[in-house]
């Protein structure tokens, strides 16, 4: 009888032993499964442009930071350079977010890459504007990516 009572007392603890990530370690797939689970009681957290309070928005460092925080979805913005490279940038120009000036669509990727990103307060950093490919390599299997500004580049995004 005593063993039976201990067994029933321990049953609720088994419910806490659920696996949140697949055995493969693909956290992004687990998040997508969670989103599609109508019985889920979990809150899914999304980050707009990454950890832009501590790093330049849409930068690799901002993405790495939110992954480290356990954020589930990274929302990013895309623009296309003059030489057809998809880069992470919210604005039509690079004026606010980098040390450079001009419209993204009028500048080559090589020229943009020479600029440094700025913080939200306009302070220059050592960070550079990443390409979509670079960002996706960082995010792969670790966080779900939501492309916010990028529908006009749909086919190019799929190619990456």
List PLM regions with ranges.
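Phosphate-group recognition and catalysis centered on beta-loop-alpha active-site segments
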Residues: 17-160
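Bacterial Sec-dependent N-terminal signal peptides
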Residues: 1-27
């Amino acid at each position: 009888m005593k063993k039976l009572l201990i067994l029933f007392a321990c049953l609720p603890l088994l419910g806490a032993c659920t696996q949140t990530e697949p055995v493969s370690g693909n956290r992004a797939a687990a998040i997508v499964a969670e989103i599609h689970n109508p019985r889920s009681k979990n809150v899914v957290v999304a980050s707009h442009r990454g950890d832009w309070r501590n790093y330049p928005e849409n930068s690799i460092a901002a993405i790495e930071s939110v992954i480290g925080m356990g954020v589930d979805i990274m929302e990013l913005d895309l623009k296309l350079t003059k030489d057809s490279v998809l880069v992470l940038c919210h604005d039509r120009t690079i004026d606010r977010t980098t040390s450079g000036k001009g419209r993204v669509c009028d500048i080559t990727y090589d020229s943009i890459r020479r600029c440094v990103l700025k913080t939200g307060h306009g302070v220059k950093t050592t960070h550079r504007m990443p390409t979509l490919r670079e960002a996706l390599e960082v995010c792969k299997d670790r966080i779900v990516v939501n492309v916010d500004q990028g529908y006009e580049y749909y086919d190019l995004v799929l190619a990456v």
